[in-house]
Amino acid sequence: MMAREYKTQMEAARKGIVTPEIEKVAAKERMTVEELMPLVACGKVAIPANVNHKCLEPEGVGSMLRTKINVNLGVSRDCKDYDVEMQKVMSAIDLGAEAIMDLSSHGNTQPFRQKLTRECPAMIGTVPVYDSVIHYQRDLDTLTAKDFIDVVRLHAQDG
């Protein structure tokens, strides 16, 4: 497989490369690729499309686009059942949600995050600062910038 000539949708748009994600978002938004590309190129529209999120149905967020439905969920000390959270994810998708925000703040969050990016077609957001505290099992004020960046990198690698 040939290497892509871009890392982000913004970079692709700036280079004049029409990606499959840009084409899909333009169709969903009932606009032409020519209308969408400048908005992506200048940052007025973002198309979150991590290459490790294999089942992603791309969506655009930003200026001149329709409002998206986001659902917040995740495990906590009080509710630790990842299967229940996945049921919530699938219900949200069935009801039309385009984005899922994983606010998990307890336990080993990586398997759940990986399951999300394997099975959930919606855009996925996470909160690396929550996971930094969990991952290192330390208070937030003791974490270094490197600790935080390492967790951000881990989240990106998970999709």
Residue ranges of each PLM-predicted region?
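Alpha/beta enzyme core
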Residues: A3-R4, T8-G159
